[in-house]
Amino acid sequence: MRAKSHRYPESSECYTDTTYYDPEDKYLDIGFQMLKSINIKRYPEFSYLEKLFINNNNLKQLPDPQYLPKIKELVCSYNILTHIPFYPNLIKLDISHNQVQNINVYNQSKLLYLDCSFNKNIETRIFLPECRELYVNDANISKLEINYFPNLRILDCSNNNISRISSLSSLIELNIQNNHITELPSYPQLVRIMADNNKLCYVPTFPNLLSLSVSYNNIVKITDQPLLKKLVANNNSVIELGNLPKLKFFDLSFNKLNSVTIPSSAKYIFLQFNNFVSVDIDNCIGCVKELQVDFNIYSRIYSKYFDNIYAINIQTNRDKLHYYLQQYSQLSNEHIVNQILNKFNGIKFKEHTKKLFGISVGLYELIFVSQTIKNTSDKESYDKYFQSVLQTDYFKKFYEFIQYVYYNSIIVTLYFNGYIS
């Protein structure tokens, strides 16, 4: 877990002049104090401190190491620091959200925990043989040599420009989201991977993996994962699934699956917008809690599972809606899209035919009937004119289009076994 002041809120806009010192635990918390400098004379306890929280201030400089001879944990995030002194006994260091570009003074140090995230272009080529947790996300780096951290357990290098990452046998948790990585090497101990929004085409088998998140990649096949419990792989090109016998939660929406074998352990299933003819959940009907599908699949399985369905919720997917509305340039601006989204989401499904007709009438009048006619006609004449418009083939085609958009952009959530989110 990332370090922070545990007496004050996370918002950097919230300050208090309360200082807390715990002589038994040997820690001092002066976070959120709007401090521009630290007057050593005000804090005689510095010489005994093992933990110091000075986060969320306006500090440009840290105390000289001679005044903190026993310090082991230092949290100085959210300041304007450019340099970090060397504290020889330090094992935990959080310098996130500063302007530091170099921490070479800690090369071969005893650090177990290092958070240097949100320091643009920071140099990470330092050897930390004992480091267990490293956070270097949002740092605008393009390269990370993780072999410099041979005992690393947790790594977060998300939101960077990294294209390659090496293998490391000790790693159990990896976050590489929002990079340019094309390949995942072997990590024999890995338990959790977060690799969304990269350029992955393939995910190898990880024998101990419990959670895998790889949305927005180019993955075609999900390989065997013997212990995997959670899979989030939406917005890929998946056409094939390996053996996933322990899966409880899986999101494979927006892929290219023609069929899927759902494991008996599955509880939360998201399969909308694939190429299914139908979906069979007989194998997990006793334990499934939530199933999300598109309208096409819903219409095919509703009667089969009618007695098992506890509740139904229908929502419109905005991306799909916007995609279809682009066929009419007049419907593609953000205001109109949001208006239609809200109207679609307000439809009770048993009334959807009537509601869709009303929505079609309103939209057709808005974009196709000239303002001149509206302004120059009296109400009776205009109503008569508009009723004649509704009988034209142009309107009928438009109404059919709105129905098509609705049916192809809604997501139907089915709840089972007494569960509702």
From Swiss-Prot:
The keyword Repeat applies. GO terms for molecular function: signaling adaptor activity. LRR repeats lie at residues 48-69, 70-85, 89-110, 111-129, 130-150, 151-172, 173-191. Keywords: Leucine-rich repeat, Repeat. InterPro entries: CDIRP, Leu-rich_rpt, LRR_dom_sf. Gene3D superfamilies: Ribonuclease Inhibitor. This is Putative leucine-rich repeat protein R380. It comes from Acanthamoeba polyphaga mimivirus (APMV). The lineage of its organism: Viruses, Varidnaviria, Bamfordvirae, Nucleocytoviricota, Megaviricetes.
